[in-house]
């Protein structure tokens, strides 16, 4: 199985790609940059876009899409359009697109306060945007953000000190959820 992951630091923190490869016995390749938005993967004038263009010439089984942390809420139109276009490209190279739905910033953090949203409100807004994008792009969804919300009492393990990047436990949880979605899809054919 070959998996391509497109995203940013939420995808490369703690070598999430390697965690996913171990869980699935798959070849996992990532095309990432800290702070990147999915729209950069579509722009051949950027390094990410040029790399993505080459990567989409290969055959893949799954393409995992992860948007900048608050992008699905604050740049919703761009997010939806990027998912639509990247999902189409994924299918053209034989892959199923899968959205890695991320989480709200840590409850009570300054980072969360800077959004003007509460923890539950940001969690729900991200959930809604990712699921709307999944409908538009015909994507599978790995609801990692929902799991972070349900496990918020373990915030010290889910997050590192900056209150938004995942700790090793958080990345492991993400790998488990993405792997479970892929296994279920393979099982259901």
Regions found by a protein language model. Name each.
Residues 2-6, 10-84:
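Conserved SGNH/GDSL esterase-like catalytic core that processes O-acyl groups on lipids
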Residues 5, 99-101:
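Structural beta-sheet core signal
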Residues 21-24, 90, 134:
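A generic structural signal for well-ordered alpha-helical segments
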Residues 29, 64, 98, 140-142:
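Hydrophobic/aromatic beta-strand patches that form the interior of the parallel beta-sheet core
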Residues 62, 68-74, 105-124:
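Serine-dependent acyl-ester chemistry module
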Residues 78-88, 92, 121, 125-132:
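Alpha-helical scaffolding segments of alpha/beta enzyme cores, especially the outer helices
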Residues 88-98, 139:
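A short helix->loop->beta-strand "cap" motif at the edges of active sites that frequently abuts
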Residues 110, 115-189:
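Catalytic His-Asp segment of secreted/periplasmic serine-dependent ester chemistry enzymes
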């Amino acid at each position: 199985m070959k998996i391509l992951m497109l995203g940013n630091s939420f995808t490369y923190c703690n070598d999430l790609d390697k965690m996913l490869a171990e869980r699935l016995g798959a070849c996992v390749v990532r095309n990432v940059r800290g702070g990147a938005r999915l729209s950069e993967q579509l722009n051949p004038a950027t390094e990410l876009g040029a790399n993505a263009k080459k990567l989409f010439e290969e055959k893949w089984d799954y393409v995992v899409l992860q948007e900048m942390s608050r992008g699905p809420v604050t740049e919703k139109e761009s997010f939806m359009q990027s998912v639509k276009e990247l999902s189409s490209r994924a299918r053209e190279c034989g892959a199923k697109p899968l959205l890695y739905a991320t989480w709200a910033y840590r409850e009570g953090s300054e980072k969360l306060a800077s959004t003007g949203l509460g923890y539950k409100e940001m969690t729900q807004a991200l959930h809604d945007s990712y699921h709307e994008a999944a409908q538009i792009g015909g994507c599978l969804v790995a609801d990692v953000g929902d799991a972070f919300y349900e496990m918020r009492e373990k915030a010290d393990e889910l997050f590192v000190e900056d209150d938004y990047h995942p700790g090793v436990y958080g990345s492991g949880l993400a790998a488990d959820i993405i792997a479970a979605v892929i296994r279920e899809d393979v099982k259901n054919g």
